């Protein structure tokens, strides 16, 4: 029978599992992330894992939501410090750097990511997309900029720019410089 944990221990262990999952997912992908190893890092048995998450997929789902929230917080902090176009550019460049460090964030077409997402319940898949869209809309509002084009087009253009990270190997030039150039030359057409 698994050990019982205090609420504080549960919070800490849950945080360790999510943090370890994030690192393992980044380094090895979904399929090669081993629950036994994550449990070992958290100091719990595999049976104890199920006190915190009903499945490997649920851990990954919670990890992905945590990653999304971290990105929103990063952008919100930058925009709070520097609202306007320059702050939005700085925030998007910071997000792009995170995308580059963690390919699982943007390589949604990979077999590894598809294998994970297909195991989620439909409402969980929908929540990931909804959270992403809602977060993007919230951040546009926090930039205090006026759109020159429809919001859906603006969001699509910015998402397309961030997807440069998924194709960086195909570029003939440094992908960070390409992203920066395209972003800097696009923002004036999106915002007034």
Task: Give the role of each language-model region.
Residues 63, 67, 71, 75, ...:
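Hydrophobic recognition helices of helix-based DNA-binding modules
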Residues 14-22, 117-120, 124-126:
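A short, Lys/Arg-enriched amphipathic alpha-helix from helix-turn-helix/homeodomain DNA-binding modules
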């Amino acid at each position: 029978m698994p050990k019982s944990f205090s609420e504080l221990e549960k919070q800490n262990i849950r945080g360790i599992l999510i943090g370890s999952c994030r690192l393992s997912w980044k380094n090895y992908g979904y399929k090669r992330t081993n629950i036994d190893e994550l449990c070992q890092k958290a100091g719990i048995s595999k049976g104890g894992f199920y006190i915190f998450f009903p499945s490997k997929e649920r851990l990954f789902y919670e990890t992905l939501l945590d990653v999304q929230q971290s990105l929103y917080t990063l952008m919100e902090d930058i925009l709070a410090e520097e609202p306007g176009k320059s702050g939005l550019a700085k925030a998007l460049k910071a997000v792009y750097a995170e995308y580059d460090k963690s390919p699982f964030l943007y390589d949604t077409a990979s077999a590894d990511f598809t294998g994970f997402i297909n195991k989620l319940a439909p409402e969980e898949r929908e929540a990931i997309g909804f959270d992403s869209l809602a977060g993007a809309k919230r951040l546009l509002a926090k930039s205090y900029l006026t759109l020159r084009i429809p919001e859906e087009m603006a969001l699509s253009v910015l998402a397309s720019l961030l997807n440069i990270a998924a194709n960086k190997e195909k570029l003939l030039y440094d992908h960070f410089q390409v992203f920066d150039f395209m972003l800097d030359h696009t923002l004036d057409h999106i915002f007034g």
